[in-house]
């Protein structure tokens, strides 16, 4: 059975539900906002599966990149809940990585040099960066764990001299 991208979008939306900037609430019509959120989600999903597929030295048992149909917006195999959650978590990371750039640009446009001497947004940016770094670390650990387990049984693979056994 195939897995629609929508299954993963829903998990991702749960992570950013309060972010009005992602959903553009109050700015566009409901339909326009949903279309843009869907386009952004698809872009983040594609970035995320490339990241998961290419991260680290271990191979994935499945081909997230090749085994998908972008026209039908679905993977051509059934993803496990672990895989769906992992992709949604990396989507959040990719979204926040873009968000930090937007925040820095916005601060540069809002504050004059004299304002920055009185009010420094450094702490806000510092804590945002720390949280993003922690999320990256958690996601990278999750990817390593995912790749070190059998996809069907979720049992740990045993690696001896770079040979893997089930």
What residues fall within each predicted segment?
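Short, solvent-exposed secondary-structure capping/transition elements
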Residues: 57, 61, 96-108
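Elongated alpha-helical scaffolds
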Residues: 80-100
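Short, exposed interaction segments that mediate macromolecular assembly or regulatory contacts
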Residues: 65-81, 109-121, 125
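Conserved short "hinge" loops at termini or chain/domain junctions
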Residues: 1-79, 145-166
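Polybasic, proline/glycine-rich intrinsically disordered low-complexity segments
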Residues: 120-156, 160
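A short, terminal or domain-edge coil/loop segment
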Residues: 84-89, 113-127, 157-166
């Amino acid at each position: 059975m195939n897995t629609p991208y929508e299954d993963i979008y829903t998990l991702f939306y749960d992570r950013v539900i309060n972010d009005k900037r992602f959903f553009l609430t109050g700015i566009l019509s409901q339909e326009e906002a949903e279309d843009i959120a869907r386009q952004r989600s698809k872009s983040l999903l594609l970035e995320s599966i490339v990241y998961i597929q290419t991260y680290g030295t271990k191979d994935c048992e499945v081909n997230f990149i090749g085994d998908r149909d972008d026209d039908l917006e679905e993977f051509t195999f059934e993803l496990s809940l672990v895989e769906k959650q992992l992709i949604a978590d990396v989507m959040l990371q990719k979204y926040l990585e873009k968000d930090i750039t937007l925040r820095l640009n916005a601060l540069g446009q809002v504050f004059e040099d004299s304002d920055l001497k009185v009010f420094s947004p450094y702490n806000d940016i510092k804590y945002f960066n720390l949280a993003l770094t922690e999320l990256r670390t958690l996601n990278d650990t999750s990817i390593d764990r995912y790749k070190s387990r059998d996809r069907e049984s979720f049992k740990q693979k045993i690696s001896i001299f770079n040979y893997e056994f089930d």
